C-alpha cells in the first residue's frame, strides 16, 4: 500500500507528520466482518459506483457505515488513496466524518459515522418519502448546511477540493437534519497554483452533471456549483433531476422550472407535500439561486461562497435584486427590443437532455 502510506503517513513535503495526526484509525477486516455480519445483504444501505455501503455495529455498541469497494485495480488503488487523503484533510461539521479505513489483501474499506436519517434522496424519493419528514425549515437547513460544506471544500481546504459528485444521494442527514456531504470518490485535490483543466472522469449524465463536464468529463469548482443548483431545485420541488417524457426524451428539471419562473408561478414549483407551510419569499430565493447556479455558461455561475451568502441573506432587497436578473425575464414578452437579448440570457439555463438515457438519481 505504498500510495496509501504515502498519503496518510507523511505530509506533502515528504516529511513525517509530527502534529495534526488524523483522528481515525485502521480497522481490521475481521473487525468489520463482525460489525456488518459478514457484509450481510440485510445490512446493505446502498450501492454507488465505487461499491456498496453497509450498516455495522462495533463491539462498543457504536454504529458505523462501511463503504466496501466492489472491484480492485490500479485505478481503484489510486482512487482509494486519494479519498483517504481527502478525508484526512477536511474538518467541517457538514462533511461526513470518517472513523477509519481497512486495507488488507484486496479489500479496501472506509468506515464512517452512521447517519440515522440516511440520505436526502431517501426522504425525497425513497423509503421515507411518504412520511414527509422534511418540512420547509428542515429543507432550508439542508440547503444552507450543504452549501457551506461545498464552499469549505472549494475555499478553505488545503489544497482546494472539487467534490465532483454533488447530488441528493451524497447528502446525508444527521439526527438534527443537518447535511453531511459525503462521497469524495470523484473528488480532486487542487493545489493553489493549479492551472490544469481538472480531473477527467467517465460518468453517465444523471441530471446533476454540468454541460461542460458531460461533454469533456473534466470537473471543476464551477461544475460543482451547477450540480448544487440542480440539487436546490430537487430539494424544493421534490422532483427528480431528470424526468422521462417518453422512451426517447428526458427533460432536465431546469426546463420545467424556468418557464414557471417566467410566469412568477413559484407556488407550482414547491413540493406539494409541503402544503402551504413554506415562506413565499424564501421559496423564490432558493429557486432563483438554483437557476443561477445551473446556467450552462460556467463563467456566469456564482461561487459557492456567494451561494451561501445568498441563501442566508434574508433581505427582501436582495431577493428583488435576484429577480431582476435578465436570466429570469420571459423571452416571449411583448417587448420586441429586449426579446433577442433576453432569449440569449435565458438559454444559459436550459440544458437539453433528449439524447440521454440515464438513471434519475
Swiss-Prot record:
Residues 195-219, 323-361 are annotated as: Disordered. Transmembrane segments: none annotated. GO terms for molecular function: ATP binding; non-membrane spanning protein tyrosine kinase activity. Residues 351-361 have a biased composition (Basic and acidic residues). Keywords: ATP-binding, Kinase, Nucleotide-binding, Transferase, Tyrosine-protein kinase. Its EC number is 2.7.10.2. It comes from the Eukaryota. Residues 39-328 form the Protein kinase domain. GO terms for cellular component: plasma membrane. This is PTI1-like tyrosine-protein kinase At3g15890. The lineage of its organism: Eukaryota, Viridiplantae, Streptophyta, Embryophyta, Tracheophyta.
Amino acid at each position: 500500500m505504498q500510495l496509501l502510506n504515502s498519503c496518510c503517513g507523511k505530509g506533502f513535503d515528504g516529511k513525517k507528520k509530527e502534529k495534526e495526526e488524523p483522528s481515525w484509525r485502521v480497522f481490521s477486516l475481521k473487525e468489520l466482518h463482525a460489525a456488518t455480519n459478514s457484509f450481510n445483504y440485510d445490512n446493505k444501505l446502498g450501492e454507488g459506483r465505487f461499491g456498496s455501503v453497509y450498516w455495522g455495529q462495533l463491539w462498543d455498541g457504536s454504529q458505523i457505515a462501511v463503504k466496501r469497494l466492489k472491484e480492485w485495480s490500479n485505478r481503484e488503488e489510486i482512487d482509494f488513496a486519494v479519498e483517504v487523503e481527502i478525508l484526512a484533510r477536511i474538518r467541517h461539521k457538514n462533511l461526513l466524518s470518517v472513523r477509519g479505513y481497512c486495507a488488507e489483501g484486496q479489500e479496501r474499506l472506509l468506515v464512517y459515522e452512521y447517519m440515522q436519517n440516511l440520505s436526502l434522496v431517501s426522504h425525497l424519493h425513497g423509503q421515507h418519502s411518504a412520511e414527509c419528514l422534511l418540512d420547509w425549515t428542515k429543507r432550508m437547513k439542508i440547503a444552507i448546511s450543504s452549501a457551506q460544506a461545498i464552499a469549505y471544500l472549494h475555499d478553505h481546504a488545503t489544497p482546494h477540493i472539487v467534490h465532483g459528485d454533488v447530488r441528493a444521494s451524497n447528502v446525508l442527514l444527521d439526527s438534527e437534519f443537518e447535511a453531511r456531504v459525503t462521497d469524495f470518490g470523484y473528488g480532486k485535490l487542487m493545489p493553489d497554483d493549479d492551472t490544469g483543466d481538472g480531473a477527467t472522469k467517465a460518468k453517465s449524465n444523471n441530471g446533476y452533471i454540468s454541460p461542460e463536464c458531460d461533454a469533456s468529463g473534466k470537473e471543476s469548482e464551477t461544475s460543482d456549483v451547477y450540480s448544487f443548483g440542480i440539487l436546490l431545485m430537487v430539494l424544493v420541488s421534490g422532483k427528480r433531476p431528470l424526468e422521462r417524457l417518453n422512451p426517447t426524451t428526458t427533460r432536465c428539471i431546469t426546463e420545467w422550472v424556468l418557464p414557471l419562473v417566467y410566469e412568477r408561478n413559484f407556488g407550482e414549483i414547491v413540493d406539494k407535500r409541503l402544503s402551504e407551510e413554506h415562506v413565499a419569499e424564501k421559496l423564490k430565493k432558493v429557486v432563483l439561486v438554483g437557476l443561477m447556479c445551473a446556467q450552462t455558461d460556467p463563467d456566469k455561475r456564482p461561487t459557492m461562497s456567494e451561494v451561501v451568502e445568498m441563501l442566508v441573506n434574508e433581505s427582501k432587497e436582495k431577493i428583488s435584486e435576484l429577480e431582476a436578473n435578465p436570466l429570469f425575464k420571459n423571452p416571449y414578452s411583448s417587448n420586441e427590443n429586449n426579446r433577442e437579448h433576453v432569449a440569449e440570457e435565458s438559454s444559459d439555463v436550459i440544458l437539453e437532455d433528449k439524447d440521454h438515457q440515464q438513471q434519475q438519481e
